[in-house]
C-alpha cells in the first residue's frame, strides 16, 4: 500500500526517537485536542516513555466527553503508545458541577476550570502516575512554564521567599493559561512538564501538521467544557438551580423590575437585565439573603480594593508582610499593580488577604480568581470574596 506523507512523517519521527538510549516514564493528559496531542508527540520525540491518560468527565459532545476519548485513543494508536481512560465522572460531578452550582446559588461567578485543575485533572493524573510506581512525571498541553527558584534571583523580591519550583506564564502572551493553574502544589510542579510552554499557538498547529497528527486541524475549543456539553451556561444553571423570583433594585433604592434568580447575573453585566432606565445600567452586586440584584451606573462599578480568600501560594511561602504584586482579576485581562496585605486572625494565622489596587478596577467579581504575579512568576492566587 502506498504510504502517505503523514505516514512518512510519523515514521521519521519514531526513527529519530528510537535512537534515544535511556527513557523516563511520563503520563500525558490527553483531551483529544491539538495541544495535548502535540505535547504527547513532543515528549516521545524527546525520549520519554509516554502513556496517554484521558479522564472521562461527562457523557456527550466536547473535548471532555465521548468525542475527546475517541480522538485521544486514535492519537495514541498513531504514536504507538499506551492509552488509559479513567472514569472520573463521579469526582467531576462532586468537585466541579456541584461546587459550581453552589457558587452560583451564593451569588458568585465561579471559575470551573480552576476547580477542575485543582480537584480533578492534576489529582487524578498524579494519583495514576504514583499507582504505576515507575512513572515519575506527568504532562499537559497547557501554555505555562516551570522553572527552579534560582530564576527569581534577577527580580526585586522584597518580602518574598521562593519555593523550589516556580510556575511561570507561558511564552505566548495571548495563550498563557497560568491563571487557571494558581492552585497547583509543589508536589505537582516537581513532577510536571509543559511541553508547549515555550511555543506559540501558531507554532503548535504548524508542528502538528508537519507530523501529520490526526488532531492537527481540529478546531480549538472556545468555551468551557460545561458550555460545550450543555450548550450554554444559562442552560447549565437552569438545569441545576431552581428559579426564584426577586427584585432588581437601583443603588438609589428604586425598584426597577423582577428577576428569576440571582444565579443568572454577574457583576458588570449589562445585557439581559430586562429593565428600562435613561442611562445604561450594570449589575453592581448580588444579595443572596435578600435575593436582590443591585444595578448602578458604570462609574459605580469601580473598586479600590478586594478581599481575597482561600489563597494558595504555589511559588512562594505565605508572606507575613505586605507585598507588591501584579494582580490579574480575570482571564484575558491585563495584570494591574497592587499591594497585598495579610489579614491576621485572632490566633495570628492568615486566611485572607486585602488587595489594594494602585488604580481602581471595574467589575471586581466575587467568585473569580485573583492571581498574583511578579514579572513572569505566578506567586499564588485565591478567590475574590
Curated annotation (Swiss-Prot):
Pfam families: tRNA_Me_trans, tRNA_Me_trans_C, tRNA_Me_trans_M. It is found in: Cytoplasm. ATP binds at residues 29-36, 55, 141. Disulfide bonds join 116-225. It catalyses: S-sulfanyl-L-cysteinyl-[protein] + uridine(34) in tRNA + AH2 + ATP = 2-thiouridine(34) in tRNA + L-cysteinyl-[protein] + A + AMP + diphosphate + H(+). Gene3D superfamilies: Adenine nucleotide alpha hydrolases-like domains (2.30.30.280), HUPs (3.40.50.620), Translation factors (2.40.30.10). InterPro entries: MnmA-like, MnmA-like_C, MnmA-like_central, MnmA-like_central_sf, Rossmann-like_a/b/a_fold. The keyword Nucleotide-binding applies. Its main location: cytoplasm. Keywords: ATP-binding, Cytoplasm, Disulfide bond, Nucleotide-binding, RNA-binding, Transferase, tRNA processing, tRNA-binding. One of its GO terms (biological process) is tRNA wobble position uridine thiolation. One of its GO terms (molecular function) is tRNA binding. The record marks 142, 368 as: Interaction with tRNA. GO terms for cellular component: cytoplasm. Its EC number is 2.8.1.13. The keyword Isomerase does not apply. Belongs to the MnmA/TRMU family. NCBIfam families: PRK00143.1, trmU. Catalyzes the 2-thiolation of uridine at the wobble position (U34) of tRNA, leading to the formation of s(2)U34. This is tRNA-specific 2-thiouridylase MnmA.
Amino acid at each position: 500500500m502506498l504510504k502517505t506523507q503523514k505516514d512518512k512523517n510519523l515514521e521519521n519521527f519514531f526513527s529519530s526517537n528510537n535512537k534515544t538510549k535511556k527513557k523516563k516514564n511520563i503520563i500525558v493528559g490527553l483531551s483529544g485536542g491539538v495541544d495535548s496531542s502535540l505535547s504527547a508527540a513532543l515528549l516521545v520525540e524527546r525520549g520519554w516513555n509516554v502513556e496517554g491518560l484521558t479522564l472521562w468527565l461527562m457523557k456527550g459532545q466536547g473535548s471532555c466527553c465521548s468525542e475527546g476519548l475517541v480522538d485521544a485513543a486514535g492519537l495514541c494508536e498513531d504514536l504507538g503508545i499506551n492509552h488509559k481512560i479513567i472514569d472520573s465522572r463521579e469526582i467531576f460531578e462532586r468537585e466541579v458541577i456541584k461546587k459550581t452550582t453552589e457558587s452560583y446559588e451564593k451569588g458568585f461567578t465561579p471559575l470551573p476550570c480552576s476547580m477542575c485543575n485543582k480537584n480533578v485533572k492534576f489529582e487524578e493524573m498524579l494519583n495514576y502516575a504514583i499507582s504505576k510506581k515507575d512513572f515519575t512525571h506527568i504532562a499537559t498541553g497547557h501554555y505555562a512554564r516551570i522553572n527552579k527558584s534560582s530564576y527569581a534571583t534577577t527580580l526585586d523580591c522584597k518580602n518574598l521567599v521562593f519555593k523550589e519550583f516556580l510556575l511561570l506564564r507561558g511564552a505566548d502572551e495571548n495563550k498563557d493559561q497560568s491563571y487557571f493553574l494558581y492552585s497547583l502544589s509543589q508536589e505537582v510542579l516537581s513532577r510536571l512538564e509543559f511541553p508547549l510552554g515555550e511555543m506559540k499557538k501558531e507554532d503548535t498547529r504548524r508542528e502538528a501538521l508537519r507530523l501529520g497528527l490526526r488532531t492537527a486541524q481540529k478546531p480549538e475549543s472556545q468555551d468551557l467544557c460545561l458550555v460545550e456539553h450543555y450548550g450554554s451556561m444559562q442552560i447549565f444553571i437552569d438545569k441545576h438551580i431552581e428559579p426564584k423570583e426577586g427584585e432588581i433594585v437601583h443603588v438609589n433604592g428604586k425598584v426597577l423590575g423582577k428577576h428569576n434568580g440571582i444565579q443568572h447575573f454577574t457583576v458588570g453585566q449589562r445585557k439581559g437585565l430586562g429593565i428600562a432606565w435613561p442611562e445604561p445600567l450594570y449589575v453592581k452586586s448580588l444579595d443572596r439573603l435578600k435575593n436582590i440584584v443591585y444595578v448602578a451606573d458604570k462609574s459605580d462599578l469601580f473598586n479600590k480594593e478586594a478581599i481575597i480568600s482561600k489563597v494558595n501560594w504555589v511559588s512562594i511561602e505565605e508572606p507575613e508582610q505586605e507585598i507588591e504584586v501584579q494582580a490579574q482579576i480575570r482571564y484575558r485581562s491585563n495584570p494591574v499593580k497592587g499591594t497585598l496585605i495579610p489579614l491576621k486572625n485572632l490566633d495570628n494565622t492568615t486566611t485572607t488577604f486585602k488587595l489594594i489596587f494602585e488604580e481602581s478596577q471595574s467589575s471586581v467579581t466575587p467568585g473569580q480568581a485573583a492571581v498574583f504575579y511578579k514579572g513572569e512568576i505566578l506567586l499564588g492566587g485565591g478567590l475574590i470574596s
